[in-house]
């Protein structure tokens, strides 16, 4: 996982040849990951998110205060845009500029009226999973999916590409098109128990959190 001093360089992997789907390894440092997790915890502190789902190991959607399953933001002035979306965009743009990649990296642009929603799903170790699916979000949006805590065994597949299976580590960000036209299938097949530095949140050793930021273009 990324460390708190940003000594591990970010790296971009193009997962699919036929659709926009990019994995950014080590996108967020441990300090940034902890900041995100602390904000999630603060915003859900008055809600009972500790109870296990009735059908273990079904993943649990974190419910925020006010009985909301998603956070909604307008503009860039929030920790999720600044640390996840902007960090990922900066890395993708740098990848194109420095390495002159022939693949067309797609990154969002933001204005003060940019709309963004954030949802968080918590997975149990080791059998937490999410069936393969297509998001079917047809509102001209892009997804930035951050993994926190224990790593996930993750699957992505495009309509014309081979299935890709990879270990989705804490601090990695997956950027992809969630539309029906893109038809990117993705899912979680299992969760790995990983080791973490002593200054990590205790929950990182018990769970995997999928933090999905959906940004309208």
Residue ranges and their predicted role:
Residues 1-217:
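Non-heme Fe(II) oxygenase metal-center motifs and adjacent flexible, charged/small-residue loops
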